[in-house]
Amino acid sequence: IKTIIEDTYKLYGFYPLDTPIIEYSSVLLAKAGGETEKQIYRFNKGDNDLSLRFDLTVPLAKYVSARYNELSFPFKRYQIGKVFRGERPQKGRFREFYQCDIDVIGDGELSLMYDAEIPSIIYDIFTKMNIGKFVIRINSRKILNGFFENLNLSDKYQDILRIIDKMEKVSEEDLIDMLKEINLTN
């Protein structure tokens, strides 16, 4: 499974990155609320206040900050690694688990194409894993616009969204007719 995920991330141009599992607590708690403090495993080693990482994003931010002038942007990275939560275990929530993370970091505004690329990556991974039928639900018109941009359909964006909004209210035949009206078939 890990190989499938890594190979797919690489196929989309993501660079592998590994960050430390143990971090200074001050780094993990910087700009965080009280909820984060409840989530981390914290311990002292000598005079050092240390914690196990609770996600892969904070260590990534530290990495980018330390190497900002050395990186090429947009910086596309992936990491698959263990993270640890100090919260009480409950159904579907574990104290130690693997997180598969991909991020695109820019030094300015990023194209929506990067957001639109994420569901494509998920689709490719799930398909390669042969998990059977699945549905990817997207609740962002900005991301949807990225898909249309990728398909060279930006000019029909508003028309397509109006049709999508009617999907559950009209028959499949009516839906096809509406798509034909804006010259979208297949």
Where are these regions (language model features)?
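Extended, charged alpha-beta segments that form solvent-exposed binding/catalytic grooves
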Residues: 1-186
